[in-house]
């Protein structure tokens, strides 16, 4: 009860008769271009994520050193009054 080879061939012939070979060629090239664009976008996204992770890893170190500088300059007012 499944699709046999004969059914698939008849289906493809009907599709070619309805759309024509030129239109099918255009659809195929458009689909190929879309797939290529998607793959390129995924590669760019991976690079961007890696750059963001590296920047995020470097950020806490800079933040800690800034906090240490602030801590050395703070004065505990309550300690002086006691």
UniProtKB/Swiss-Prot annotation:
NCBIfam families cross-referenced by the UniProt entry: PRK02958.1 (NF002813), tatAE (TIGR01411)
Membrane topology summary: Single-pass membrane protein
Predominant cellular place of this UniProt entry's protein: membrane
Keyword Lipid metabolism recorded: no
Transmembrane segments annotated in the record for this chain: 1-21
Keywords attached to this entry: Cell inner membrane, Cell membrane, Membrane, Protein transport, Translocation, Transmembrane, Transmembrane helix, Transport
Keyword check for Zinc-finger: no
Function comment: Part of the twin-arginine translocation (Tat) system that transports large folded proteins containing a characteristic twin-arginine motif in their signal peptide across membranes. TatA could form the protein-conducting channel of the Tat system.
Family: Belongs to the TatA/E family.
A Pfam family assignment: TatA_B_E
Name of the featured protein: Sec-independent protein translocase protein TatA
Organism, as annotated: Leptothrix cholodnii (strain ATCC 51168 / LMG 8142 / SP-6) (Leptothrix discophora (strain SP-6))
GO biological process: protein transport by the Tat complex
Molecular function via GO: protein transmembrane transporter activity
Entry GO terms, CC: TAT protein transport complex
Cell compartments where the protein resides: Cell inner membrane
Subunit architecture: The Tat system comprises two distinct complexes: a TatABC complex, containing multiple copies of TatA, TatB and TatC subunits, and a separate TatA complex, containing only TatA subunits. Substrates initially bind to the TatABC complex, which probably triggers association of the separate TatA complex to form the active translocon.
């Amino acid at each position: 009860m499944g699709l046999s080879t004969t059914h698939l061939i008849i289906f493809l012939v009907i599709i070619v008769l309805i759309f024509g070979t030129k239109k099918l060629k255009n659809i195929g090239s458009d689909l190929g271009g879309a797939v290529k664009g998607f793959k390129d976008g995924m590669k760019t996204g991976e690079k961007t994520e890696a750059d963001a992770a590296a920047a995020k890893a470097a950020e806490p170190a800079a933040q800690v050193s800034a906090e240490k500088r602030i801590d050395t300059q703070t004065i505990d007012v309550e300690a002086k009054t006691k």
